[in-house]
Amino acid sequence: MTNHEQDQQDNSELLDDDQVTLESQQAADSGAEAPASDDVAALQAEIARLNEELQTTKENALRAAAEAQNARRRAEQDVEKAHKFGLEKFVGDILPVADNLERAIDAAKAEGADLGVVVEGVELTLKTLVDGLKRHKVEQIDPQGEPFDPQLHQAMTMIEQPDVEPNTVINVFQRGYTLHGRLVRPAMVVVSKA
């Protein structure tokens, strides 16, 4: 064999070795690509699932926010109605008092009016008013003859009364009122001195 033939054979063997190495590397690369493409597909599927989950969560959050806003709006409307119409029953109970006072004025203006009848009508009107107030938990404070209570009474003056216990209410200028037990207006009274 000549050198030239020997070189060709060596080159041919080298080419064969390179080709085998290249083929094995390509095979290895294609094997690596297959699992990589499976991983990519799995990751893309996971991304799609997470995007769908995110969209659902966003929709649920928007729905919850809308429901909360609607509930807040309904509550505000209920409070507004309560403020507007909360006194409706009270007004209904007080209107007969206004009607009776108008009748009493008309009766007092009539010629030859019996003052006793007018007084009786006004007393009945006052009773109607007090009863209407009681239905709404407004109670009168009429402390005549009771011990003075600075929580419920306001002393206008003090007078010496030897026959009355000291610090006793001897006269009521103006009755007081409570609403559900809470003082609205104290009774204005005269108290006996000690």
UniProtKB/Swiss-Prot annotation:
Localization annotation: Cytoplasm
Tagged with keyword Cytoplasm: yes
A GO molecular-function annotation: unfolded protein binding
Superkingdom: Bacteria
GO biological process: protein folding
Location of region: Disordered: 1-39
Major place of residence: cytoplasm
InterPro entries (alphabetical): GrpE (IPR000740), GrpE_coiled_coil (IPR013805), GrpE_head (IPR009012)
Keyword Membrane (UniProt): no
Gene3D superfamilies from the UniProt entry: 3.90.20.20, Head domain of nucleotide exchange factor GrpE (2.30.22.10)
Record keywords, A-Z: Chaperone, Cytoplasm, Stress response
GO cellular component, one term: cytosol
CDD domains tied to this protein: GrpE (cd00446)
Function as written in the Swiss-Prot or TrEMBL entry: Participates actively in the response to hyperosmotic and heat shock by preventing the aggregation of stress-denatured proteins, in association with DnaK and GrpE. It is the nucleotide exchange factor for DnaK and may function as a thermosensor. Unfolded proteins bind initially to DnaJ; upon interaction with the DnaJ-bound protein, DnaK hydrolyzes its bound ATP, resulting in the formation of a stable complex. GrpE releases ADP from DnaK; ATP binding to DnaK triggers the release of the substrate protein, thus completing the reaction cycle.
HAMAP family attached to this UniProt entry: GrpE
Name this protein carries in UniProt: Protein GrpE
Species lineage: Bacteria, Pseudomonadati, Pseudomonadota, Gammaproteobacteria, Cellvibrionales
Gene from which the chain derives: grpE
